[in-house]
Amino acid sequence: GYDFEMVYYNADGREGSMCGNGGRCIVRFAHDIGIDRSRFTFLATDGEHLADVKDGLVSLKMIDVNYINTSDNYSVLNTGSPHYVKQVDNLANLDVFNAGREIRYSDAFKEEGINVNFVEVMSDGSLKVRTYERGVEDETFACGTGATAAALVFYKNEEGFNTVDIEVLGGKLNVSYNRNANGTYNDIWLKGPAVKVYEGEYHIQDKHIISKA
């Protein structure tokens, strides 16, 4: 069985696809309210996920990725949510909102939408990533499935174990995974901090619910 199920809603109020950082945060929430596990197992819209909490960092196992569609200057893949990944040279000065919005609402993607990630590859092999997210319809501080997508596209080792450090607006993440000879990816783990921002309580339909985040 599962320790819990995660249902994720986008800022537009609609139920969304997998949220990697949301998954890490819900594991931290479960840990903080006393669900004591050496390893968590939970269900999300894209299937089963494993996770653990250690030294203030939450590691989340992502779904396997069986293929990446690559064109001349971008790649498209699904890491639990659909992602468009494009390399750029000067990420800091990029207008992510307008550039991302143009791609998200292009004829190829406007019907179902897509998350758009712009990636700058640093000299040490680490990545800087900025993401325009569908459902939010704006740039966000961090996108876990997007960071994962970028790490898979810009692998270091053609075959075998890879680990990629990623800097996003909200902080730093790490993605580790195994790349197979046939171009598939498995044992994908997204790791980073998850910090409580506030505690509050609210009432819904006369039911008293405590919310902690």
What are these regions (language model features)?
Residues 1-18, 23-142, 149-213:
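Active-site proximal loop and beta-alpha junction motif in alpha/beta enzyme cores
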